[in-house]
């Protein structure tokens, strides 16, 4: 195994360190200012009397000798209008500090991580500024959006990775690591879940009147032709695995019909320019025969609709990710992945039992009756979140459970870093020998 020295910027709780140490890396220093993160980091890597935390990177100039500089640069709200404002936001300024440290210390290579918004077309200028700045310092620069799911982590987590290698080293052939297939399911990872007897992929394929297959998966990680192995609680979209508040709360068939009509028409441009617009009583009455405004008021009382001061109506649960009653998605035990863990928390939960069905209607009905109504679902625990992020069971966390969810959500997934570390080794960056990933 090729050994190399690295420095862990924006170290958090050590996701980068775990990954790089697994492939021969030796951490010579770290930099972190979050006190809760520092406490967890020190629990897992005692200082032996010498504090190697460099602190605030904005005050750092010369770094200890190292080969690779790494870090998950805190994200900024990527809504920059022009080049002159590109790093005005304090979080954007941290990119300028990272570039400065690379310029001063000239590591052989670097790996930096950021949220997927950095590669959004709206933020193309910001990305180009960052990449060009590194190129101007003499680095060959590569970037790619990687999903942790593709590296054995049971989480749908897209992140941008920027890799740079000194051009003067004349190393060619760097490529991002290949994806790995995994057959693991959430019931392999999370605690006390019922092991399903029937896999969802065995549910018969749905076809239209012309015999063409209907792809009912609504996530890029869901196999084509298979039902989602999670249900979405929301009032603004429809689909085989979408569940609406009027399917949960006591409502009449007439009320259900009214709600479905509103949902199907609220995005019509005649009612406004938004992706979903409030509608007046007159708007809705044109679509629902014999509608009395009292019917809409009853739905307001049931907290299915809300009424604005101008008299227009909108769904009470009008944000997709806000879900219903604080729950957005409920994943089944046989799901291949969980939702993205974030520092701000999440509205995803896990079902304690599995359900199946011969068709979409039966599948949804069984979920509502067997999981949703009896509330056989729950939030994940800290230890489960750690596993979903790729941390080992031996890792020690903070005594504050709320802090742990934030710290885990902020961390990079160590298995992705393992793969990136191997990819760097394969271009003979540290030793003149061949290797295989």
UniProtKB/Swiss-Prot annotation:
It comes from the Bacteria. Its EC number is 2.1.1.37. Disulfide bonds: none annotated. InterPro entries: C5-Methyltransferase, C5_DNA_meth_AS, C5_MeTfrase, C5_meth_CS, SAM-dependent_MTases_sf. GO terms for biological process: DNA restriction-modification system; methylation; negative regulation of gene expression via chromosomal CpG island methylation. The active site is at 75. It catalyses: a 2'-deoxycytidine in DNA + S-adenosyl-L-methionine = a 5-methyl-2'-deoxycytidine in DNA + S-adenosyl-L-homocysteine + H(+). It is an enzyme of class 2 (transferase). CDD domains: Cyt_C5_DNA_methylase. Keywords: DNA-binding, Methyltransferase, Restriction system, S-adenosyl-L-methionine, Transferase. NCBIfam families: dcm. A methylase that recognizes the double-stranded sequence 5'-GGWCC-3', methylates C-? on both strands, and protects the DNA from cleavage by the HgiBI endonuclease. This system is less active than isoschizomeric RM.HgiEI. Belongs to the class I-like SAM-binding methyltransferase superfamily. C5-methyltransferase family. This is Type II methyltransferase M.HgiBI. The gene is hgiBIM.
